[in-house]
Amino acid sequence: MIIDKLSKRINERSIVCVGLDTSTDYVPEKIKKGKKVSEYLFEFNKEIIDNTKDLVACFKVQIAYYEAHGIEGLIAYKNTLKYLKDNDLISIADVKRGDIANTAKEYAKAHFEGDFEADFITVNPFMGYDTLEHYLPYLESKEKGIFVLMRTSNPGSKDIQYKDYKGQPLYYEIGDNLNKIAKDYLGECNLSCLGFVVGGTQSENANKIRERYPNIMFLIPGYGAQGAKPEDIRVYLDNFKKGIVNSSRGIILNYRKFDDGEENIGKYARKAVEDMRKDIYCE
């Protein structure tokens, strides 16, 4: 199962997930010169991937940064996912799909097959749990996985997710129902191919959330630029075995801190990953 592969990568490499949220603004002009958007976005991503792949569990590609540039951007998105697959690296397509019925079926096909194939995708359950229906057959095949939004890292998460529902925050109602579904898709590592997105910026109830869902892998955004603290993140990881911690700008823009950064983008991305690992693992 793909969750077993991810679990193994965490144990062998680290809990770090590199976010390839690659804005065109992040790419130095010297790389852009004379190239199409599809070419320079992929070139930038490849530099990051090549210099960090042995240190990290996986890579998360946020589709919005590519969709914004039409066909050219989506070519870069496709090529990035293909490069990850060709190098036996685990990919998460951050697409946050949240529709139902035949539309969800087409979304599942779009992101688990063909040009945009990824190992995991992110899913939004706001419309109801039938949003998951057409992704589950891909989990049954043991080759794909999903991370479903449970409690997110953005400040506005409290507008809805923290609302009282039967005496507890609404996010527990979401998590409890997802947990029932997730138990049908356990790997040998005793974790499910249905994971949760749990923001690291909110330390409230961290221990309770981790204990309540022992068979769930957490995708944890918020580290770095968003300010999640390592001591809070460690709780969600459960001895560094049940979570991956995403950092995007903190890694891919680290080169901007150095005078020779534009000539050494990959080198400084690697340094950011090394520093992140030391920070979280207390090395």
Swiss-Prot record:
Keyword Lyase on entry: yes
Keyword field contains Cell membrane: no
Any GO BP annotation: 'de novo' UMP biosynthetic process
NCBIfam families tied to this protein: pyrF_sub2
PANTHER family, A to Z: OROTIDINE 5'-PHOSPHATE DECARBOXYLASE (PTHR43375:SF1)
Family classification: Belongs to the OMP decarboxylase family. Type 2 subfamily.
Pfam families, A to Z: OMPdecase
Residues forming the catalytic site: K96 (proton donor)
GO molecular function: orotidine-5'-phosphate decarboxylase activity
HAMAP family: OMPdecase_type2
EC number(s) per entry: 4.1.1.23
Name of the protein in question: Orotidine 5'-phosphate decarboxylase
Organism per entry: Finegoldia magna (strain ATCC 29328 / DSM 20472 / WAL 2508) (Peptostreptococcus magnus)
Domain of life: Bacteria
Signal peptide extent: none
